[in-house]
Amino acid sequence: AIGRTWQCGTIQLDMLMPERFNLEYIGEDGEKHRPVMIHRVVYGSIERFIGILIEHFAGAFPTWLAPVQAVVIPIKTDSEAQMVYAKELMAKLDAAGIRAKLDDRNETLGYRIREQQGQKVPYMLVIGDKEAESNMVSVRDRKDREEFKNPVTAEDFILYAADEIKERRL
């Protein structure tokens, strides 16, 4: 992403360490010889690869790879109807295999949306009284794609997101 090269696992020939440790062996000719060490370093390969992914996507992972794929944001966290619907929606998302979280903190709606944008969550599902009454969601897409004519039914969003995850779309 920023043009650097990365090294994951390595295999190295080391001629210095045997000398430092004064390592020797007796060869077929009966003489002492200095060995050459072979190092294999796979330790950290997974961590390095994750670092490469984070850098490549600048933290904005594709939906299938994102740790949190959708966040449910009720407009009024003190509204019983919105909170009941938010929890029902969370159960539906979970049943569909969509990793979601509920942002029901006592902060302003704008603050919660900005924070989720900063976290680069692929989808924000904003629900108010109208959405709760009609089983709909207002979708805020991280990429500002035009797939959603808001509001959409919760089922339509779930089908779309589950398909995107299954196909591993970028």
PLM feature spans:
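NTP/phosphate- and nucleic-acid-binding module
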Residues: 1-170
